[in-house]
Amino acid sequence: MSLAHLRLLLSSLESLAPLSLAGSWDNVGLLVAHSRPTPEATPPYNVYLTNDISMQVLEHSLTAFDGQPASLIISYHPTPFQALKKFTLESPASRVVLTAAAHNTAIFSPHTSWDAAPSGLNDWLLDGIVGALGEGGAAVRARGPVRLAAGDMGARGAGDGRAATLAAPTTLAAVVEGVKRHLRLGSVAVSLPASCGAAAAGGAEAVRAAAQGVPVSHLAVCAGSGGSVLGGATSANVWITGEMSHHELLAASAAGVAVILTHHSNCERGFLPVVAGRLGALLGDRAGEFRFLVSAVDADPLTTL
């Protein structure tokens, strides 16, 4: 990929979600790149979107475009995430970096900047769930971040997590079905509020029955691992995220909050096609200079059998 085309893509990605919105602990932006482009490379350049980069995903990206490699991988989760003290093939993260560099494939990660951005991942997650409640979706009376970003970006609706107050109450059972419908999942994990008593001890059918009687007028979402963020959504009846710790779940239940867990990346991956479409729209007349492909082999490592 030419440096001019790489800069054009990076500028478009910054327009979608400024990297300044990412957590201070995060590793975002252009993580792997050659200083010089491949001389024979010409448009269209190949852009591969994935939630995570395992070696299986990387190997697929190297032949996914009619046998040609990706010029740029946009990976929601960063690789590397933590600092690498050495680069050897024995380390999974350094193996990915070395292999990508050897094929002149750049790696970009937005991670928490996508989470916090207005119209970003958490807005997509909330809107999709609310829109999947019942036949025509549910009306929302109020909405916003669980934790507002500072400054001008906060005024524009940026921040961590998203919460919404429904115009009319629904049930936990309906929200469960809405989550499954939006994320195209066959199952999710559900933690009941303590008011449901010992229903959880009765197994799945008892939990389903109890969920029918749990009213929900206020819900909160956080993509990925949302325990620390959702703790601030104190008025919510239900928290929706990918994963939480055992003790976070117990504390939520004791506080009267139901929890729906999807597995970490299952509430993130569906946003990738949306990003591909938005990038194409931003690029306008120059969109034809790129080919976008969402990974067909990237998947959450956990499967419920």
Residue ranges, per PLM feature:
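Active-site catalytic microenvironments in core metabolic enzymes, especially phosphate/sugar-handling
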Residues: M1-L305
